[in-house]
């Protein structure tokens, strides 16, 4: 939160100009929620705790760097995390840059339409959690 307004940490994956949400693979035997916390910590340098599930998206892309090229199908579940501690300069090698954005700016800055939708749902989840605490 900055001045009472929610903020979101977005990443620029290595060698890309895209702004995206952190995500990654679940390790064998790892619960999805723990994977979300771990991947967020690795990719952003920030630690957080799960507030709630936002949604799951499905998409595919062609990995042209593979020979022969292959189509990759992904299913990604996003969770809202509450920031606890950390330093965005401590992100891992998979990421070139991490920045905090006010949530409205994050929605407009996110490169991928499905992730814009996730951010809009996160905004609603944050608002509903704020209402519950009143």
Regions found by a protein language model. Give the residues of each.
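Short acidic, glycine/proline-rich loop/turn micro-motifs
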Residues: 20-24, 62-65
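C-terminal alpha-helix
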Residues: 121-129
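The catalytic Nudix box helix
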Residues: 21-55
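A short, flexible beta-alpha/helix-coil linker loop
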Residues: 16-18, 86, 106
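NUDIX/MutT-family hydrolases
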Residues: 78, 82, 89-119
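N-terminal strand-loop-strand
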Residues: 1-21
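Active-site segment of metal-dependent pyrophosphate-handling enzymes
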Residues: 45-86
């Amino acid at each position: 939160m900055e001045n009472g307004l929610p903020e979101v940490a977005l990443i620029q994956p290595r060698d890309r100009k895209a702004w995206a949400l952190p995500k990654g693979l679940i390790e064998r035997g790892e619960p999805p929620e723990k994977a979300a916390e771990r991947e967020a910590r690795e990719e952003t340098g920030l630690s957080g705790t799960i507030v709630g599930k936002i949604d799951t998206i499905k998409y595919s892309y062609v990995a042209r760097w593979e020979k022969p090229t292959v189509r990759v199908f992904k299913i990604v579940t996003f969770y809202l995390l509450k920031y606890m501690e950390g330093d965005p300069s401590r992100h891992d090698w998979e990421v070139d840059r991490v920045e905090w954005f006010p949530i409205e700016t994050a929605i407009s800055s996110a490169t991928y339409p499905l992730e814009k939708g996730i951010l809009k749902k996160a905004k609603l989840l944050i608002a509903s959690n704020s209402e519950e605490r009143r």
